Amino acid sequence: MKDNTVPLKLIALLANGEFHSGEQLGETLGMSRAAINKHIQTLRDWGVDVFTVPGKGYSLPEPIQLLNAKQILGQLDGGSVAVLPVIDSTNQYLLDRIGELKSGDACIAEYQQAGRGRRGRKWFSPFGANLYLSMFWRLEQGPAAAIGLSLVIGIVMAEVLRKLGADKVRVKWPNDLYLQDRKLAGILVELTGKTGDAAQIVIGAGINMAMRRVEESVVNQGWITLQEAGINLDRNTLAAMLIRELRAALELFEQEGLAPYLSRWEKLDNFINRPVKLIIGDKEIFGISRGIDKQGALLLEQDGIIKPWMGGEISLRSAEK
């Protein structure tokens, strides 16, 4: 495992957005300017924009707020939350420790080296720019009871963001949040467990907060950040509130399933009563979205007939001209 101590100290010094000379940084960290430059490159590899201005030194384009475990844990009533600077993926971190976790245990990271989205896709995860959060839950009723879970997670995330001031956030079937018709957040639910056995579930969420650019090869749809929409939220408050609300929602979901959430989905549905297309492999199916049914399937109207659609291979997009 690479030692990230120095780059992490460096980012903490640069986090205020001011200029810092290589000399100053070298003195503080007890190393040469050349060594500082090498660690600056690590930060760039993590997706951090570090400017270099001759005669002034290094600076970030704007201050960044780093995650603070003490602040996050101080807003929660117990349960374990790992706050990690650099990790392969928050979901993988929990999956690797599944035997020792309790329902509601969570993990948050500044940077994911191998973040992943639905269908094994890469999830673009620059350092300190977004929120990457995963939570473990053990569903005693088994894997079949998890149907509709990603919808519940989406509703909770949208409601939390709205409470904190991002009041135009909406949900998109089956596992995204949208703002201004662009993707703001994604959800990945990973499940292990056999039929007749409890399901071990790891829920991952990534929220775009302030990233400035993306790798086009990784992001295949229009995206937006809270910052671009003029919304600046405290990352630590957001993380704590999400963990608290997700724990409560998962308890309710365990007892009552999707039923209590159906009307909440309808209020937040980004595409309800709008022309959409479903993409399944290389096939496109056009119709009007009519919300979801009791199982969480997407209801699509074609020629006056409404049919439910369900499945991990379906993508939903707008079909408005």
From Swiss-Prot:
Domain of life: Bacteria
Positions of the DNA-binding region: 22-41
Phenotype for residue 52 to S: 5-fold increase of repressor activity. Increases binding to DNA
Swiss-Prot/TrEMBL keywords: ATP-binding, Biotin, DNA-binding, Ligase, Nucleotide-binding, Repressor, Transcription, Transcription regulation
Substitution effect: residue 57 to S: Lack of repressor activity. Does not bind DNA
Example GO BP: regulation of DNA-templated transcription
EC annotation from Swiss-Prot or TrEMBL: 6.3.4.15
GO CC terms: cytoplasm; transcription repressor complex
Keyword Hydrolase in annotation: no
Consequence of substituting residue 61 to A: In strain: RDD012
SUPFAM superfamilies: C-terminal domain of transcriptional repressors (SSF50037), Class II aaRS and biotin synthetases (SSF55681), Winged helix' DNA-binding domain (SSF46785)
Substrates-to-products reaction catalysed: biotin + L-lysyl-[protein] + ATP = N(6)-biotinyl-L-lysyl-[protein] + AMP + diphosphate + H(+)
Effect annotated for changing residue 70 to E: In strain: RDD012
Residue ranges annotated for the BPL/LPL catalytic domain, each copy included: 67-254
Regulation: The switch between the enzymatic activity and the repressor activity is regulated by cellular demand for biotin. The switch occurs by swapping of protein interaction partners by holoBirA. In conditions of high biotin demand, holoBirA associates with apoBCCP to transfer biotin. In conditions of low biotin demand, holoBirA dimerizes, binds DNA and represses transcription of the biotin operon.
Function per UniProt: Acts both as a biotin--[acetyl-CoA-carboxylase] ligase and a biotin-operon repressor. In the presence of ATP, BirA activates biotin to form the BirA-biotinyl-5'-adenylate (BirA-bio-5'-AMP or holoBirA) complex. HoloBirA can either transfer the biotinyl moiety to the biotin carboxyl carrier protein (BCCP) subunit of acetyl-CoA carboxylase, or bind to the biotin operator site and inhibit transcription of the operon.
Family: Belongs to the biotin--protein ligase family.
Name of the protein: Bifunctional ligase/repressor BirA
Protein's gene: birA
